[in-house]
Structure formats: structure tokens, C-alpha cells
Amino acid sequence: MSISRREFLKANAAVAAATAVGVTLPVKMVEAAESDNIKWDKAPCRFCGVGCSVLVGTKAGKVVATKGDPESPVNRGLNCIKGYFLSKIMYGKDRLTTPLLRMKDGKYHKEGEFTPVSWDVAFDTMAAKWKHSIATKGPTSVGMFGSGQWTIWEGYAASKLHKAGFLTNNIDPNARHCMASAVVGFMRTFGIDEPMGCYDDLEAADHFVLWGANMAEMHPILWARLSDRRLSSKDCRVHVLSTFENRSFDLADNPMVFHPQSDLVILNYIANYIIQNKAVNTDFVTKHTKFALGVDDIGYGLRPDHPLEKKAKNPGNGKSTPISFDEYAKFVSTYTLEYAAKMSGVEPEKLETLAKAYADPKAKVMSLWTMGINQHVRGVWANNMLYNIHLLTGKIATPGNSPFSLTGQPSACGTAREVGTFAHRLPADMVVDNDKHRAITEKMWQVPEGTIPPKPGYHAVLQSRMLKDGKLNCYWTMCTNNMQAGPNINEEMYPGFRNPENFIVVSDPYPTVTAMAADLILPTAMWVEKEGAYGNAERRTHMWHQQVKAPEGAKSDLWQLVEFSKRFKVAEVWPAELIAKKPEYADKTLYEVLFANGVINKFPTTDCKGDLNDESEHFSFYVQKGIFEEYAAFGRGHGHDLAEFDRYHETRGLRWPVVNDKETLRRFVEGSDPYVKAGEGYNFYGKPDGKAVIFALPYEPAAEEPNSEYDLWMSTGRVLEHWHTGSMTARVPELYRAYPDAQIFMHPEDAKARGLQRGDEVLVASPRGEIKTRVETKGRNKPPRGVVFMPFFDARQLVNKLILDATDPLSKETDFKKCPVKVMKA
């Protein structure tokens, strides 16, 4: 057998990818565990949104090993390096086991020292603060910041407690920082959220196009499947677009490093190329799409008095007007190859190669994107533009033809999006500012008409501003570390946490940066210390049983939310006019109205087939099943169908809609989606007319650009070994040793021009602050001249405090990828 040099290099890239995934590292450890009297059970991985299934090995009440689940259709027995060390995330030396309240002279004090207290004292203190705030300032003075790492029932309980209990929509998940632009993109184009394709498309595509997605490190199991397809199919090609070279470039046939923000130009160029070269699928476009012109100059989601916001003509305006195909073609006609090459810095032949792949009617194309597209001040537009390309060519919802938005958290889809824990959303894609949607939800929740406020609550970035301004006073964060992960910490977030008017509660297993800035820390159960359910990026809902007990004193987020609701009588938090509609509720607790409501509490604990279920034992009913079934009723018959609860414990997950116990691989297409009738071909049924929208949207610049003082673009992101802020992975000795400290990746010539060498300590500064770190001029990430990259996992180097809190005005998602900085020797 002969092999070309190019194929040899590609094969080496695959080996490198497998090594990065961690396939070979812990084999001996796993083999040893097989014969050591360990009990194994399934669970989805605790980390990213891929949704790998792992087998969890327990012994003597402790998780002692994890390995890839060979029965999983997602990861097929593989784990990435983080997945292999899951068994250690719960056993950090500084695990919290008792509530900690800031106290001075025996009572709570904002400037006091953290002091151990009982759960009763913690909840009594919290409840008193909440009741006082609601009574004196109204329900909008309380709020919560949650997580795409919540289980489905935790997110549902949190949303219901706030929207129907405390009468506030001031609840938002950290998925606002990562997936909000994807959500709004789906809703604008299709009228319904989440991908139409599935992971099976990885085995069918001819071309893979990565848009701001370093899959080799951030989604390594999917990258392994993609690599296998590339190396086993001689005609398969990989195109990678990024603002700097990363490990995904190792497999790229068509690598492209573009200037920050110019992806918008490239996307419109491709649409123009398709039209100019008569590659439009005219039949598909005529039958299944329509065109619209979006509003431009929409601002940057900053405070209203910010100069950039005052300058915008249409701040936050997401409206559009119908146009014809010819008008759309004229709109994109100015986005020529020459203009795209000039704006992006990418060689014209590479751009044309990419455009030809999309335009070729015989080629199946899978577009994959994540934070590079979403964490973008025009992230919604970028999502819409990606769909434009697939809709113009009809390359959508068939095997290998898939515009696929990747998620970063294990249940950003299943909990944050599907459950509706955003400040503007309700379950099953309903929204709070729609009268009909509120009425449906109020009926399902058995609360009076008018219970749910019609105005969206404070989104993530706005929560920080309102804390600082003293308008949001009681604030509970769960399952997230926003003081490290969020933007503009110095100017907005930290002042809000330490505002003397505010009482801040953080639920976390560990003393994170966020926890240490709070007034009360609540110790939390983790992962398989509780029963859970996640929903991954391909609409797969996957459940697990509790497999070990949490350390004594640590309680799950679900327990905390439901137990806290017992502290409130309806009459203490609802106005008289609302109680008058349901006077029988006046003397009841929120717990009785929201959770012991005859629906959630109707399933006995004997229904639970797992060995443990501490929450259900405490509440004396199968609380997880009850919440799930109440929640699932929202989507059944409405395109979001979930299977019966018990089915998920029997499987490695099912992809919704699940109709007649059959999952759906691809949506909107006849023969796969049960909501598409025979003879329709396609039906984008999220829209009343069944047609998807192709948007005419322009290029607009970033909120900030480098200047004479801050002369470098900086992007922040992740690395393979750590997940998000490292609050779990940095406590795993093997992962910490593999990557102990963050560095700033620079081009060698940029370092030389500043008198710097690899390993030098430097100051990195933006208009909002500065940090110390060390220079890396080699290694896995290779920025071009003028660009630097720094990961945000290191709690000792809070790089995101340099980031401006500019957001996409439509999705309110922060742009973490484009910040002007200067780098100097420390």
C-alpha cells in the first residue's frame, strides 16, 4: 500500500487528534477497574455540549473511575481527556460542605468574615432579605443567574419559582454568554430553536466548514468522528476559518485566518457567489423560503449613555421588511471576491474554494460553529447568514447537509433553551411578552391569569448593571462562576456584588471567584450525587440516576430551590389583586402552590429505579419525574415532544421530537420529521407559512478596534485540558499538571517588537484594567501579527475583566472575541 506525503500528514493529524481526545491515556487504569468489584452505571458527561455517555464506576460510596460508554451513539466508547478524569472532579480538597455566611459580632454583616452556619440559618437569612426587598422595592429587585449546567428539573424549578412564585422574570442562565445568539438566529430564520440536523451528518458530509470553532480542543469527540470521515473518504475536505491558527488547522485542507469581524463579509460573499454562478436551488428557494431586509446600525448593547450606543441610529432593533429575491441578490452583489479578500485578509483563491464547495450541487456540506460566531456583536446576523447559504442551495436537513450550531455546556439546549430559563422565555420556545404564551403557561402551572410579568427580565449583562445601580438587590447565582467568566468585571460586576444595598448568594461545590465575592455560599451536590437529565446539541435528552451520596451538608440545586420555596407564604410575595383571583392560595406556601401541586407530587418514590434519590426521599415523592412530566406536557403535540420519563433511563438518550416512541434524526423534512406531512417535502413549521427566512444583513464593525495605544486584538477562549473557568478541572491533579497556568499566545514578531521573549512576564491592559501573565510564542495556538489569544480558565488571571460588556443587541450575548489590548513587559 502506498501513501502520499499529504495523506501521511493527514494521518498524523488524526493520531494527534486522537491523542488530544485522550483515547490512549487511561486504558490501563480502566482495565484495572474492570476486575476490581466496581459497580458501573451510565451518565452523560458533566462537561461540554457534545453529550458523551460515560460509564461511572462506584465503590464504597465513591466514584472511583469513568470510561467511555460503548453503547453510546454519540461517543461510541471514547472519552476526551476531561471525560476520563470525571471521577476526580467531586473530590477537590476544598469541597464545601456547610453554608458560609458573612458575619460580624454574631450576625450577618456585608463586610464580615465567612462563618459556617446551618441550612436553616442560611435560608432564614435569605428569606428575610428576599421578603424585605419584594415588600419595599417590588419583585424586580430580586433575581437569579443560572446555568446551562443545571439539570432539566433544576432549571425548570428555578424558572417556575421566579416567574410564578416571586413574580419576576429576572432569571437568566450563563448560556446567555454562549448560546443566546444561536437561539435568536434559529428563531428569526426558522421560528423554532435548535438544530435540524444531528451528529450522524458527520459520517455523510463531503465538506466540513468550521466557523470560529476549534473542535479539536472544544468538541474533541465530534472532531474524532469528523477526522475519521476526512481520512476514510478521499473526496472529503475540511475548511477552517478562525482569527488565529489552532489545533483544528492540523486537518484543514483549506485553512483561513481572517481579520476579526470580517466573517460577516465572507458570509455575504459566499451568498453572492452562489447567486452569480447560478447555483441557487430555485425550486427549494421558491417553495420553502422568503426574503427579508434587516435593520442596520443597531448599536452594541451598551449602557444607553455610552457614546457608541448614543451614536447608533437603531439601537436594539431586530425588525425586518419583506423583499424579493432580486432585491436580496442586489444587496449581496457588492460583497465581491475582491472586497471579501481585502476585508478579511484571506487569499482570494481560498475564499473561492470555500464558495465553490457550498455552490456545488453534488457536494454535501456541514457547517459547524460555536463561540467565534455566537460571542460576536453581530452574532445573530452571523447565524442568519450561515442559514442563508444553506437555504439558497437547499443544503439543509438531509444526510450530510447541515448547518450545525455546537453548544458548549452539557444542557445549554436541554435546560437553558428548551426549559426556558432565559429572562424572556418560557418552556417550548414560548416567550413572556406573548399574551397567549403566558396564558398557556399560567394554566399549566395552575396560577392566576396575570401571574407572569409580560416584560422580559434583566438579562445576564443587565443584571450586573442593575446590581451596581442598586435596582437588583437580592441575587442568587447557581452552577456558574460569572465573576471569572463574565465581562467587564472591574467596572460592572464586582461593584454590583459588593454594593452594600445588595445580598448575594452563590451555590457552588467549591470556593470559586464568584463565591468569594458573595455574602452567602451554599454547598452544592455535584453530577452523579443527584439524579439528573441533560439535553445536548443534537436535541438528545439523556438521564442518569444518583450513584453516590454528596458529602454531608452539600445539597443539590433542586433541593435548594424547592426547599427555599417553603419559606414563603403566597400572601408575603403576591399582591392582593392577584391573590383575589385564587384566594385559596393566600395561606399556602410557594412550595404547595408550585411543587406540591397535585401534578409534580403525584409520583411515589417507589417509581424510582435507581439505588439512591436523596431529593425524592426528602420530599416524599419522585420530584424529578413529577417536574419532568409537568414540563414535558408543554412540548408534546407542539414539535418539542419528549418521551415518557422512564424511557430515558432505559436508553442513551433520545432526540426530540419523540413521537410514538420514535426519535427524530432530522427536522423539517418529509420522511424524517413526523410534523412534516407527506407531499410537503419540507416544512419549516416554526413559521406560520412554513417558510424559512433568508435575511439581507450588512457588515458592521466591532464595538472596539485596536488603536495607537491598545494596538492588538485579543480573543479569549478555552483549552482542551480545562473546562470554562477551571473550577472543576483545575482541581483534578492530572489536568492541572497538564496545563497549570494560562498564558497569552502571541506572534513571535509581535513579541520581538515589544522586546519580549517566550516565557517573559507581561502586563496585558485594556481600557478596563490589566492582568499579569506570561508570553507564549509557540505551542498550539498561533495568532497572526496583531492578534493575541488567552484562555480564561485560570482564576489567578482574570482575563475577562479586560473585556468590554458589549453585546449583540438582539441576543444580549457578549463579544469575548474582539478586545483591543496592549502588552508590555511587567
UniProtKB/Swiss-Prot annotation:
Binds 1 [4Fe-4S] cluster. Keywords: 4Fe-4S, Electron transport, Iron, Iron-sulfur, Metal-binding, Molybdenum, Nitrate assimilation, Oxidoreductase, Periplasm, Signal, Transport. GO terms for biological process: cellular respiration; Mo-molybdopterin cofactor biosynthetic process; nitrate assimilation. The keyword Iron-sulfur applies. Residues 38-94 form the 4Fe-4S Mo/W bis-MGD-type domain. Mo-bis(molybdopterin guanine dinucleotide) binds at residues 82, 149, 174, 178, 211-218, 261-263, 371, 375, 481, 507-508, 530, 557, 716-725, 800, 817. It comes from the Bacteria. SMART domains: Molybdop_Fe4S4. The keyword Phosphoprotein does not apply. Residues 1-32 form the signal peptide. Its EC number is 1.9.6.1. GO terms for molecular function: 4 iron, 4 sulfur cluster binding; electron transfer activity; iron ion binding; molybdenum ion binding; molybdopterin cofactor binding; nitrate reductase (cytochrome) activity; nitrate reductase activity. It is an enzyme of class 1 (oxidoreductase). InterPro entries: Asp_de-COase-like_dom_sf, CT_Nitrate-R-NapA-like, MoPterin_dinucl-bd_dom, Mopterin_OxRdtase, Mopterin_OxRdtase_4Fe-4S_dom, Periplasm_NO3_reductase_lsu, Prok_molybdopt-oxidoreductase, TAT_signal. Belongs to the prokaryotic molybdopterin-containing oxidoreductase family. NasA/NapA/NarB subfamily. Catalytic subunit of the periplasmic nitrate reductase complex NapAB. Receives electrons from NapB and catalyzes the reduction of nitrate to nitrite. PANTHER family: PERIPLASMIC NITRATE REDUCTASE, RESPIRATORY NITRATE REDUCTASE. This is Periplasmic nitrate reductase. It comes from Shewanella oneidensis (strain ATCC 700550 / JCM 31522 / CIP 106686 / LMG 19005 / NCIMB 14063 / MR-1). The gene is napA.
